[in-house]
Amino acid sequence: MLEQMGKQAKDAAFILAQLTTAEKNCALSIIAEQLEQQAPLILAENAKDIELAKQNGLSDALIDRLLLTQERLQGIANDVRHVISLADPVGKIIDGGTLDSGLKIERVRTPLGVIGTIYEARPNVTIDVASLCLKTGNAVILRGGKETQFSNKILIEVVQNALEQAGLPKFAVQAITDPNRELVMQLLKLDRYVDMIIPRGGAGLHELCKQHSTIPVIVGGVGVCHIFVEKSADQNKAVFVIDNAKTQRPSTCNTLETLLVQHSIAEEFLPKLVSHLSAKNVKYHAKSTALNILKQAGANVCEVTEKELRKEWGSLDLNVVVVEDIHAAIEHIRQYGTQHSESILTSSQNLARQFINQVDAAAVYVNASTRFTDGGQFGLGAEVAVSTQKLHARGPMGLEALTSYKWVCEGEYTVRK
């Protein structure tokens, strides 16, 4: 089954690589239109997944990731249209010149080929990845979690029908619909056809891919994100940033998980934060100084464990740690962070610069919420993933991250001396 799927994807990628930007944009436009026109059917299938998720006792955070609404579906269609508006990187000349030999060389962006994406309860990823791959001339094999079986099946049907309407091979976008986990292992070994694996999910999925794949894997997505409130921060504005970073959409990987507060302002600042978040049902996890202050402020708080400081909650749980200064904050991030997104709230330009220079993360913020680490927010279009590794791509992966390059060399029957 996967051998055939891989061959079909490879053949489709050969065709996609030759398409003009206009031809690719036409297909994307039809996909966006079909998402809107088929919205009632898509939402009905998604409702089946939601009902099964509830019956199986899945967490609220997981159900939120799984849920499609009319608003979210429209947002997905809009993201596809935004991808249309973006410059096509394929064929772009990165650099080049003429050598002493007279040989003219250029480094030109090309599609990667076939992308394999393994993800969990995120039906939006189906369209995000498909649209970015199509724009960059890549074929894709998708494997969503069993929680999204109904949603993914209808979304793939919509995309494949749109591709056929555009005169393109429907096998450019394929999905493994069988929930058998052994098929994931087979996909990870399909290096004859697949050029890159992108996992979208928790730490367990990323570890599985790293350990078993014979194909290059993009590592990332797990976000234990921190915000450090330095003593010179505007406290009244800081509570709004923390509110946004923690409560806007707790299930995302760019959500705040651990708040670091400088010791000298902790007794003043933390009660303000508790008051501000009083209606948001935030549960705090803290120790020593922070635990005592939060208890006195009437917060719903318990003692934090070492394991929880490394945990991506994906919920309204928030770790709070009081640190002595910026050095202690940076050291905490070095020890517990996942190199995803880290932020400092401060009025000091010098300390902001120190934080930027010393914190090793895909995205580093000054006086802003970590929630901006997103392809759409960064102007990249719908992202395919957030990479926390350092080779090939880092941070939100947009179009250019789905390309490679080739050296194009032109001569006049030139020979090497």
Curated annotation (Swiss-Prot):
The keyword Cytoplasm applies. InterPro entries: Ald_DH/histidinol_DH, Ald_DH_C, Ald_DH_N, Aldehyde_DH_dom, G-glutamylP_reductase_CS, Glu-5-SA_DH, GPR_dom. GO terms for molecular function: glutamate-5-semialdehyde dehydrogenase activity; NADP binding. Keywords: Amino-acid biosynthesis, Cytoplasm, NADP, Oxidoreductase, Proline biosynthesis. It catalyses: L-glutamate 5-semialdehyde + phosphate + NADP(+) = L-glutamyl 5-phosphate + NADPH + H(+). SUPFAM superfamilies: ALDH-like. Its EC number is 1.2.1.41. Catalyzes the NADPH-dependent reduction of L-glutamate 5-phosphate into L-glutamate 5-semialdehyde and phosphate. The product spontaneously undergoes cyclization to form 1-pyrroline-5-carboxylate. This is Gamma-glutamyl phosphate reductase. It comes from Haemophilus influenzae (strain PittGG). The lineage of its organism: Bacteria, Pseudomonadati, Pseudomonadota, Gammaproteobacteria, Pasteurellales.
